Amino acid sequence: MKFSPLLDELIQSLRCLPGVGPKSAQRMAFQLLERDRKAGLKLASALSSAMSDVGHCQSCRTYTEETLCPICTSHKRGTSSTICVVETPADVLAIEAGGHFTGRYFVLLGHLSPLDGVGPEELGLALLERHLASGDVAELILATNPTVEGEATAHFIADMARRHKVMISRIAHGVPVGGELEYVDSTTLALSFNGRLPL
């Protein structure tokens, strides 16, 4: 069945979301049109505002509507000498949800991937190097993902940071709390044994 052009455009637009295929997009569109037009209009307004007004913090590169994000402008955290390097703004939210890190962040917005044309320039490493050269950074925590690309990115940044006499650490990888060993993959188990701590 052929839909109206506007409905078809809505369905096709919803498909840009991760994990949303044609059927899911169609269900979402029908839900908004049949049962919740008010929420649909609110979604459209929020989406339009976010797309036009949300940019990147000039210091850490996370999402913000201002020049600097709330963490970078915080009196307690904006002057912290510890920077945690992450791949995405979603990683910042995940770490913040834990409530244990009290320093600043630097968001790469990806990882090194020469085959995809992603090099140091695309990750904003010149800005990170300026932070390191300022003398205000005592420790750099590398919290890139434990993937081949994430590890390569962490090693590249560590080499860069060593030139500035900054302490470098890498977040631990291993068995998750509440996890059962029989379900943990061999690579994660090896990392857990290699990174074990004395009691």
Swiss-Prot record:
Gene Ontology MF terms: DNA binding; zinc ion binding
Zinc-finger in keyword set: yes
Protein's UniProt keywords contain Isomerase: no
Domain Toprim span(s) in chain numbering: 81-176
Parts forming coiled coils: none
Chain positions of all zinc fingers (C4-type): 57-72
Cross-referenced SMART domains: TOPRIM (SM00493)
Spans traversing the lipid bilayer: none
InterPro entries found in the cross-reference section: DNA_Rcmb_RecR (IPR000093), Rcmb_RecR (IPR023627), Rcmb_RecR_Znf (IPR015967), TOPRIM_dom (IPR006171), TOPRIM_RecR (IPR034137)
The entry's keywords: DNA damage, DNA recombination, DNA repair, Metal-binding, Zinc, Zinc-finger
GO biological-process terms attached to the record: DNA recombination; DNA repair
Pfam families reported in the protein's UniProt record: RecR_C, RecR_HhH, RecR_ZnF, Toprim_4
Gene3D superfamilies given in the database record: 3.40.1360.10, 6.10.250.240, RecR Domain 1
Function: May play a role in DNA repair. It seems to be involved in an RecBC-independent recombinational process of DNA repair. It may act with RecF and RecO.
Family annotation (PANTHER family): RECOMBINATION PROTEIN RECR (PTHR30446:SF0)
Family the entry assigns: Belongs to the RecR family.
UniProt name for this protein: Recombination protein RecR
